[in-house]
């Protein structure tokens, strides 16, 4: 089995004359932010923390906030490297979930964020689209399992998944970015359909 190489020194730097790493093209920036969201959503350490509500009842919101502060690094800095992203993720886990992640799993996530940025810089959205489709499938699987559990029905028909329309892919991806990366608090609805009361103010960085 081959081992994937992880470049701990990976970094990106703003082009000459620019003060940050934001993309001027809205689609480019939206795809990048979606990509960051998808990468962070697949981080096992954070996923476990959210599933077990280690950050309290608003654990899911905290995950989106962590995505936001990683995106903000690129909005505020001229140079962002894997070490900075890794450090940001680890501190956020301690501050928001009281969890000290010691398995080095934050580094591959950080490097993948850098890779996503480079892909978006080159207008290559294949990886972002792949991650988004994988996330959608994971959500469908979770929903199917919930339905089977609630109804107590062992019929495999409950796990049928609707066909995905490729023509709507771009539109759906554009719509999901504001939901996952938002600078303004939006209503948070739990799995049972109840709206959660969000805390006032922003958490510290």
Swiss-Prot record:
<dbReference type="GO" id="GO:0043022">
    <property type="term" value="F:ribosome binding"/>
</dbReference>
<dbReference type="GO" id="GO:0000462">
    <property type="term" value="P:maturation of SSU-rRNA from tricistronic rRNA transcript (SSU-rRNA, 5.8S rRNA, LSU-rRNA)"/>
</dbReference>
<keyword id="KW-0539">Nucleus</keyword>
<dbReference type="InterPro" id="IPR019398">
    <property type="entry name" value="Pre-rRNA_process_TSR2"/>
</dbReference>
<comment type="function">
    <text>Required for 20S pre-rRNA processing.</text>
</comment>
<keyword id="KW-0963">Cytoplasm</keyword>
<dbReference type="GO" id="GO:0005737">
    <property type="term" value="C:cytoplasm"/>
</dbReference>
<feature type="compositionally biased region" description="Acidic residues">
    <location>
        <begin position="152"/>
        <end position="177"/>
    </location>
</feature>
<dbReference type="Pfam" id="PF10273">
    <property type="entry name" value="WGG"/>
</dbReference>
<keyword id="KW-0698">rRNA processing</keyword>
<comment type="subunit">
    <text>Interacts with RPS26A.</text>
</comment>
<dbReference type="GO" id="GO:0005634">
    <property type="term" value="C:nucleus"/>
</dbReference>
<feature type="region of interest" description="Disordered">
    <location>
        <begin position="144"/>
        <end position="205"/>
    </location>
</feature>
<dbReference type="GO" id="GO:0000463">
    <property type="term" value="P:maturation of LSU-rRNA from tricistronic rRNA transcript (SSU-rRNA, 5.8S rRNA, LSU-rRNA)"/>
</dbReference>
<comment type="similarity">
    <text>Belongs to the TSR2 family.</text>
</comment>
<protein>
    <recommendedName>
        <fullName>Pre-rRNA-processing protein TSR2</fullName>
    </recommendedName>
</protein>
